[in-house]
UniProtKB/Swiss-Prot annotation:
UniProt protein name: Photosystem II CP43 reaction center protein
Origin species: Solanum lycopersicum (Tomato)
Residues binding [CaMn4O5] cluster, per UniProt: E367
Gene name per UniProt: psbC
GO molecular function, one term: metal ion binding
Propeptide residues per the UniProt entry: 1-14
UniProt remark on cofactor binding: Binds multiple chlorophylls and provides some of the ligands for the Ca-4Mn-5O cluster of the oxygen-evolving complex. It may also provide a ligand for a Cl- that is required for oxygen evolution. PSII binds additional chlorophylls, carotenoids and specific lipids.
C-alpha cells in the first residue's frame, strides 16, 4: 500500500549504521523523501548528488555573469558606482580592473569580459549538471572510485576536506598574484586620493598578521576588520593561502586521530551542519567587514561607511564655519564641549558634536590633517585641500542609512539623494543570510546528533496530535 508519508522519512541518517539499505530510485517510496525535499533523496546516490551540485554551481555562475552584464549595461560613468545600486562592479574595480586615479572608471571592457566569461562557464557547468543528474551513473563508487565516497568513511571525508582546503588556498593566492604581478589592485590610501598600484612590500610578519586575530572586536581595536593597509591584506592572503594548502595536504595524507573520530559525528547531515555553521560565521564577518572597512571595500566604489559619513559632515561644517570666521579651536557647542573639536578619552583632538562617537574612524581624505595628537589645528587652518572638501561633502550626503524605499542618507539632510548604499545592502544581506545559515546549522546538527545517538526522529505519523483534532473546515 502506498502511504502518503514514509515510515523511513528520517531513515536516511541511519544508513551509516545500517549497511543493508539499497536505494532503488529517487521517489518517496524508496528514499523516504518527497520530491520537494530536494537533495535529501540523493544522499546515497553520489553520481546524482554530483549533478545537483554542479547544476547549482552553474546557477550561481550564471547569476554572476548575467548580473555583471546587467550592471555594465546600466552603468553611467559620470555617477559614482555607489549611487547606481551596483554590487558586482565595485568588486571588480577594487581588484584594479577598469579604474584609474581617484577610482574613476576609465574602461568598462574588463567588466564586460568578466560577465561573458562567467556566462560561458555557467553553460559548461549547466551541461555538466544536467548530464550527471540525468545521464551519468547513479553512483560513482564502482566506476570512478576516486570520486566515490561513503559518508561514514572518515579517511575519505578528510581527503575531500583536504582537496577543498587546497582549492581555497589557490583562491587566496590568486588575489596575491593579481596584487603582485597582474596589474595590482585599487588602493584607496594611494597619495592624492586613491589609485591602482602593485603591492610590492608585503606584510609577512606573523606577529602583525596574527595580531589582528588577537585584537578585541570592540571600539578602536576592531579585530581583523580594523585592517587598513593593503600590504597587510595581501600578506594575510599569503599566510591564509599557505595554511589552507598545507592543511589540505595534511588532511589528504593523514587519517583522523582517535579524539576526532570520537568527538565528531560522521554522517552526511553532520557535514552539512558543519558547513552551514562555517558559512554563518563567514556571513557575520563579511557583514562587519563591508560595513566598517573602507580599505578592502573602498568608499570610492561602495560609498562611505556610517562613521565616515558622520565625520565627513562634521568636517564639512568645520570648513564652512571656519571660512565664515569661526575660531574652530575654541568654539563651544550647546553641551559645553567643543563645537567643532574636542578631546577623545585618550587625549587626541577629535571632531566635536554627535560624531565624537566615531572618533576612531580612519579615512584617506582625513588622515593628512592628523598630527601626533589627533587632528592638527594648524593643518585644519592652513592645509585643507579642495579634494578633501569635495570628498567629504559628497560622503556627507551619501550616508549608508537608506531604507528599502530608497529614501537614502540622513533623513533630516536636505541635500540627501534618492539612494541606498551598497554597503547597506551587502551588510544587511550577509547578516540575514548568515543568520539563516546559522539556524540551518542548528537544525541539521540537532538531527545528525539525534540520529547518531539513536533517538526517535520526528513524531509518529500514525498518532500525530493533529489527526485527532477537528478539521479546520
Amino acid at each position: 500500500m502506498k502511504t502518503l508519508y514514509s515510515l523511513r522519512r528520517f531513515y536516511h541518517v541511519e544508513t551509516l549504521f545500517n549497511g543493508t539499505l539499497a536505494l532503488a530510485g529517487r521517489d518517496q517510496e524508496t528514499t523516504g523523501f518527497a520530491w520537494w525535499a530536494g537533495n535529501a533523496r540523493l544522499i546515497n546516490l553520489s553520481g546524482k548528488l554530483l549533478g545537483a551540485h554542479v547544476a547549482h554551481a552553474g546557477l550561481i555562475v550564471f547569476w554572476a555573469g548575467a548580473m555583471n552584464l546587467f550592471e555594465v549595461a546600466h552603468f553611467v560613468p559620470e555617477k559614482p558606482m555607489y549611487e547606481q545600486g551596483l554590487i558586482l562592479l565595485p568588486h571588480l574595480a577594487t581588484l584594479g580592473w577598469g579604474v584609474g586615479p581617484g577610482g574613476e572608471v576609465i574602461d568598462t571592457f574588463p567588466y564586460f569580459v568578466s560577465g561573458v566569461l562567467h556566462l560561458i562557464s555557467s553553460a559548461v557547468l549547466g551541461f555538466g549538471g544536467i548530464y550527471h543528474a540525468l545521464l551519468g551513473p547513479e553512483t560513482l563508487e564502482e566506476s570512478f572510485p576516486f570520486f566515490g565516497y561513503v559518508w561514514k568513511d572518515r579517511n575519505k571525508m578528510t581527503t575531500i576536506l583536504g582537496i577543498h582546503l587546497i582549492l581555497l588556498g589557490i583562491g587566496a593566492f590568486l588575489l596575491v598574484f593579481k596584487a603582485l604581478y597582474f596589474g595590482g589592485v585599487y588602493d584607496t590610501w594611494a597619495p592624492g586620493g586613491g589609485d591602482v598600484r602593485k603591492i610590492t612590500n608585503l606584510t609577512l610578519s606573523p606577529s602583525i598578521i596574527f595580531g589582528y586575530l588577537l585584537k578585541s572586536p570592540f571600539g578602536g581595536e576592531g579585530w581583523i576588520v580594523s585592517v587598513d593597509d593593503l600590504e597587510d591584506i595581501i600578506g594575510g592572503h599569503v599566510w591564509l593561502g599557505s595554511i589552507c594548502i598545507l592543511g589540505g595536504i595534511w588532511h589528504i595524507l593523514t587519517k583522523p586521530f582517535a579524539w576526532a573520530r570520537r568527538a565528531l559525528v560522521w554522517s552526511g547531515e553532520a557535514y552539512l551542519s558543519y558547513s552551514l555553521g562555517a558559512l554563518a560565521v563567514f556571513g557575520f564577518i563579511a557583514c562587519c567587514f563591508v560595513w566598517f572597512n573602507n580599505t578592502a571595500y573602498p568608499s570610492e566604489f561602495y560609498g562611505p561607511t556610517g562613521p565616515e559619513a558622520s565625520q565627513a559632515q562634521a568636517f564639512t561644517f568645520l570648513v564652512r564655519d571656519q571660512r565664515l570666521g569661526a575660531n574652530v579651536g575654541s568654539a563651544q557647542g550647546p553641551t559645553g564641549l567643543g563645537k567643532y573639536l574636542m578631546r577623545s578619552p585618550t587625549g587626541e583632538v577629535i571632531f566635536g558634536g554627535e560624531t565624537m562617537r566615531f572618533w576612531d574612524l580612519r579615512a584617506p581624505w582625513l588622515e593628512p590633517l592628523r598630527g601626533p595628537n589627533g587632528l592638527d589645528l594648524s593643518r585644519l587652518k592652513k592645509d585643507i585641500q579642495p579634494w578633501q572638501e569635495r570628498r567629504s561633502a559628497e560622503y556627507m550626503t551619501h550616508a549608508p542609512l537608506g531604507s528599502l524605499n530608497s529614501v537614502g542618507g540622513v533623513a533630516t539632510e536636505i541635500n540627501a539623494v534618492n539612494y541606498v548604499s551598497p554597503r547597506s545592502w551587502l551588510a544587511t544581506s550577509h547578516f540575514v543570510l548568515g543568520f539563516f545559515f546559522f539556524v540551518g546549522h542548528l537544525w541539521h546538527a540537532g538531527r545528525a546528533r539525534a540520529a547518531a545517538a539513536g533517538f526517535e526522529k520526528g513524531i509518529d505519523r500514525d498518532f500525530e496530535p493533529v489527526l485527532s483534532m477537528t478539521p479546520l473546515n
